[in-house]
UniProtKB/Swiss-Prot annotation:
This is UPF0597 protein Dde_0807. GO terms for biological process: L-cysteine catabolic process to pyruvate. Belongs to the UPF0597 family. Transmembrane segments: none annotated. It comes from Oleidesulfovibrio alaskensis (strain ATCC BAA-1058 / DSM 17464 / G20) (Desulfovibrio alaskensis). HAMAP family: UPF0597 (MF_01845). Pfam families: SDH_alpha (PF03313). InterPro entries: Ser_deHydtase-like_asu, UPF0597. One of its GO terms (molecular function) is L-cysteine desulfhydrase activity.
């Protein structure tokens, strides 16, 4: 029987763990462009995009599915020309080669302009399209698929109130704690949580694709080749890193396969999922054991990202890998004490890894984070955990997570500004 609060946890999972095609920052722009074009009611002649600095940072260097190229401008163009606004983060699933070519031509002709929206929330996109003497505008804010306003010729056709979210803050009614997550993951009826196995299916499929072909930096594929050369061990830790990195390789290169995202991020969804899947394979875990571990991982990531904010100066893969470590602990027979140690070990180890945008190099960060996550879980199972005497770690796990969030939201604002300045100042 479901406890009343468990229904809300399930609703959170259905809201935050969803399929996404392509890196979610350029896809958010594609979605906003698709909504603007649909509101215009015809093929646009020009597109003007204004985005927050963090959204720009995460969309500059990553492949856009179906286009063979990168950047916010092509994402906006193909979103407007071939995107389906009703498909959310899979907005580009039906993109045709002809529409992709038209988008590339539009960009080449200088008919797509992208700029930074000064003073905007961390996650913000505004797309204005013109054509046939008419103009339409869409606004997306706070979440990757959260369209809050549509206008045509200056008249509002759709509008919802915009919550004044404090990125990295904590809402009073937030239902999750690590103890509550652990209770739900271990005690909820299996039939109520079995849906999470779809994350394993989708994300394993893109991992297999990443191993089969040469994508991006080939991090996962190179690990696989080195195993075959007997230069690396084929142990469970290496398998976890290999599968996760391979999936990230393919995703960052713009492969047209969906992944199950987490908190608006495909790489974080992959990182929450594939290390747990790897351990389940080697431990010969049942579907129910895998499902419970995935629930532990995905809800932990949702909880930590809620504290930290969707777009941060900190690399989100480290949070997702910490969450995966908690799922791995469950598969190895650990309990809440080991979960606590895993998170403390991660906060004391890899906290501070910067986010310098979505790109093929993310697969290397994913690999590093997963390796640390596995190490943290294994140390935790042996009774080893960093305690409050060291650095930003606290014995109270919720305070430990809050310290990490404070580092990312308050402590690294200047670092985030410098990173973006370096990126946009690069010469072509």
């Amino acid at each position: 029987m479901l406890k009343p609060e468990w229904s809300r946890y399930i609703d959170l999972l259905h809201k935050e763990v969803v399929p996404a095609l392509g890196c979610t920052e350029p896809v958010a722009v594609a979605l906003a462009a698709a909504h603007a074009a649909a509101t215009l009611g015809r093929t646009p002649d020009r597109i003007e995009v204004k985005v927050s600095g963090n959204l720009l940072k995460n969309g500059m260097g990553v492949g856009v599915p179906g286009t063979g190229t990168t950047g916010m401008n092509i994402a906006a163009a193909v979103g407007a020309l071939g995107g389906d606004p009703q498909r959310g983060l899979e907005v580009l699933a039906g993109l045709t080669p002809e529409q992709a070519e038209a988008g590339r031509q539009m960009v080449a002709e200088g008919r797509v302009d992208v700029s930074v929206a000064q003073g905007a929330p961390l996650l913000y996109a505004e797309v204005t399209v013109t054509g046939g003497g008419h103009t339409a505008r869409s606004v997306l804010v706070h979440e990757h698929s959260n369209i809050v306003r549509l206008e045509r010729d200056g008249e509002t056709v759709f509008s919802v109130p915009v919550q004044d979210l404090s990125q990295g803050g904590v809402e009073e009614k937030w239902p999750l704690t690590m103890a509550a997550i652990h209770e739900f993951a271990t005690q909820a009826p299996y039939d109520a949580i079995a849906f999470i196995l779809e994350a394993a299916r989708l994300n394993e499929a893109i991992a297999v694709e990443g191993l089969a072909r040469e994508y991006g930096l080939k991090v996962g594929r190179t690990i696989d080749e080195n195993i075959r050369k007997h230069l690396m061990s084929d142990d469970v830790s290496t398998l976890a890193v290999k599968l996760t990195a391979a999936a990230s390789d393919a995703r960052m290169a713009g492969v047209s396969l969906p992944v199950m995202s987490n908190s608006g991020s495909g790489n974080q969804g992959i990182t929450c999922t594939m290390p747990v899947v790897a351990f389940a394979k080697r431990l010969e875990s049942s579907d129910e054991e895998l499902a419970r571990a995935l629930i532990m991982s995905h809800l932990t990531s949702i909880h930590m990202k809620h504290r930290l904010g969707r777009l941060s100066a900190l690399c989100g893969a480290t949070v997702a890998a910490a969450a995966a470590g908690c799922g791995i602990v469950l598969l190895m027979g650990g309990g809440m004490e080991q979960v606590d140690r895993t998170i403390r070990n991660m906060v004391g180890n890899v906290a501070g890894m910067i986010c310098d945008g979505a790109k093929t190099g993310c697969a290397m960060k994913v690999a590093s984070a997963v390796s640390a996550g596995v190490q943290s879980a294994m140390l935790a199972m042996d009774g080893i955990g960093i305690d409050r005497r060291e650095g930003i770690v606290e014995d109270d796990i919720e305070l430990c997570i809050a310290n990490l969030a404070r580092l990312g939201s308050d402590g690294m604002q200047e670092a985030d500004r410098v990173v973006l300045d370096i990126m946009v100042s690069k010469k072509p």
